[in-house]
Amino acid sequence: MSETISKHDTENEKKIAQEWFRELRDQFCNKFEEIDGGKFTRKTWKHSGEGGGEMSTLKGAVFEKVGVNISTVKGEFKEDFRKQISGTEEAPNYWASGISVVAHMQSPFVPAFHFNTRFIQTGQKWFGGGADMTPSILNEEDVNFFHKS
């Protein structure tokens, strides 16, 4: 009985995570469009038997190019890599869903920005991710603000 509940809960968590990343993608795209005035184009992609995702791209007046991408993938880790990943001791399978945002500005005074987060399930589950800014023209005040945030 507990295995059935656990499996159901795991599948529900996957569904919730996918929907949350989709909603987060829509929020990012809406805000970028509001700032820029341009519109995103969307393209889906699939990887045979291992999942897929949607790429959203905007080229505009404020942003040279923005990509807001979501994906859900599954598969099996190769044996040599499996040892480095938590939760793969009993089974080498993984499932992951996430979002990645990359924004390059028209102005060299505004840093490029990257953000990603993902939900990963092996025999364990966790969220991972990060963010970074890459300035074309270094502004120490911006650097300090970013690192304090």
Label the model's feature ranges.
Residues 1-2, 55:
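Intrinsically disordered, low-complexity regions
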Residues 2-9:
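Short, charged/polar, low-complexity loop and linker segments
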Residues 9-86:
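Gly/Pro-rich turn-and-neighbor structural signature
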Residues 28, 85, 99, 146-149:
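Generic structural signal of hydrophobic/aromatic residues within well-ordered alpha-helices
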Residues 29, 33-37, 107, 118, ...:
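Hydrophobic/aromatic-lined pockets within catalytic cores
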Residues 54-129:
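Internal mixed beta-strand/loop scaffold within catalytic domains of large alpha/beta enzymes
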Residues 123-149:
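Compact, glycine/acidic-enriched structural inserts
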